[in-house]
Amino acid sequence: MRKIAIYGKGGIGKSTTTQNTVAGLSEMGKKIMVVGCDPKADSTRLLLGGLAQRTVLDTLREEGEDVELDDVRKVGYAGTLCTESGGPEPGVGCAGRGIITSINLLEQLGAYADSEELDYAFYDVLGDVVCGGFAMPIREGKAQEIYIVVSGEMMAMYAANNISKGIVKFAEAGGVRLGGLICNSRNVDNEREMIEAFAAKLGTQMIHFVPRDNMVQRAEINRKTVIEFDPAHSQADEYRTLARKIDANEMRVIPSPLEIEELEKLLIDYGIAA
């Protein structure tokens, strides 16, 4: 089983990218579990047809310790298994701790057992803050492979660089590696070239450039992935291509994060900060 975590700054399109990629992989016959590690609990919505899933933390709060796997795991599009860790009540507690609690519970309940015959476990992780809890999938070796969703916008690249620093910190102990950058385009000038250059400086690859298309929003309004909503659309093929590239990817690196001056120079060289 490959354990993959998707990181990236808030609002960059991590959950959308993850769910569409998972839909592409499940079309290829892969068995996948998606674990949402974001207090918003929107990491599985499109796979479940908009069904608001009861989170692990809510279930624990309401049921106590007496929880079955089916209480916290739902079956979504093409047989994908969907779980949301959820978060604490606003203003109380630490969302990062919630992720730790959730993943530990899933392990205890046998969600990762060989009998489940999983090909992939995907963690969709809130990514601006590489605080202890959110870094947990990396730190504890729960995920071995990281993909960072990025765009040509300054804050997205800044967050990606920070996440890379987190990977370096835990790479030696946990064996975690960076698999590549996924560029979720915002139609910034010279975006593709800039992210390719950024990836090269980090020592990794831009595994795929996902063009911006309103079909993504249209599918989301209909509570579906693009692959389910309009399978013949060119955007569905983009996600299928990304899924195939991830499935075939053997590049795993410990990244070399940039100094802030280098990052700013990159932005200036490609015209965004001019």
Swiss-Prot record:
It catalyses: N2 + 8 reduced [2Fe-2S]-[ferredoxin] + 16 ATP + 16 H2O = H2 + 8 oxidized [2Fe-2S]-[ferredoxin] + 2 NH4(+) + 16 ADP + 16 phosphate + 6 H(+). Keywords: 4Fe-4S, ADP-ribosylation, ATP-binding, Iron, Iron-sulfur, Metal-binding, Nitrogen fixation, Nucleotide-binding, Oxidoreductase. Pfam families: Fer4_NifH. GO terms for molecular function: 4 iron, 4 sulfur cluster binding; ATP binding; metal ion binding; nitrogenase activity. The reversible ADP-ribosylation of Arg-97 inactivates the nitrogenase reductase and regulates nitrogenase activity. The modification ADP-ribosylarginine is found at R97. NCBIfam families: nifH. ATP binds at G8, K9, G10, G11, I12, G13, K14, S15. This is Nitrogenase iron protein. Binds 1 [4Fe-4S] cluster per dimer. [4Fe-4S] cluster binds at C94, C131. Its cofactor is [4Fe-4S] cluster. The keyword Oxidoreductase applies. The lineage of its organism: Bacteria, Pseudomonadati, Thermodesulfobacteriota, Desulfobacteria, Desulfobacterales. The keyword 4Fe-4S applies. HAMAP family: NifH (MF_00533). Belongs to the NifH/BchL/ChlL family. Homodimer. Its EC number is 1.18.6.1. InterPro entries: NifH/chlL_CS (IPR030655), NifH/frxC (IPR000392), Nitrogenase_Fe_NifH (IPR005977), P-loop_NTPase (IPR027417). The key enzymatic reactions in nitrogen fixation are catalyzed by the nitrogenase complex, which has 2 components: the iron protein and the molybdenum-iron protein. One of its GO terms (biological process) is nitrogen fixation.
